[in-house]
């Protein structure tokens, strides 16, 4: 058991070393794509889980818009991914109106408003 703990500690130290060596913009871009994937998962549900997709899309937008010019080579890709997932959200929202939006209330956030 002690050997397993030592091996796990060594592995954690190696992961920390690799993360510390990577540019922060690369690590953040990876996490932003995780938000994209999370939104896509919620949008692909039947029916789409629009409230949960909104959270992921809003998180993605918050990071991309706040760090303009600081996301390195991944920035154009992240902006395009954000635009695509927002477009998918709008299309699915129109095809699957929630009871609240049918009553005149619209969901805020993920559509870019």
Predicted regions and their residues:
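A charge-rich, low-complexity, intrinsically flexible signal that marks solvent-exposed coils, linkers
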Residues: 1-113
């Amino acid at each position: 058991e002690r050997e397993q703990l030592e091996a796990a500690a060594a592995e954690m130290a190696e992961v920390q070393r690799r993360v510390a060596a990577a540019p922060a913009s690369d690590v953040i871009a990876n996490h932003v794509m995780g938000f994209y994937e999370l939104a896509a998962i919620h949008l692909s549900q039947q029916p789409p889980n629009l409230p949960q997709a909104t959270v992921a899309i809003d998180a993605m937008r918050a990071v991309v818009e706040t760090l303009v010019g600081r996301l390195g080579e991944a920035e154009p890709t992240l902006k395009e991914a954000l635009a695509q997932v927002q477009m998918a959200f709008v299309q699915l929202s129109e095809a699957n109106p929630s009871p609240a939006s049918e009553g005149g209330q619209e969901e805020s956030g993920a559509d870019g408003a």
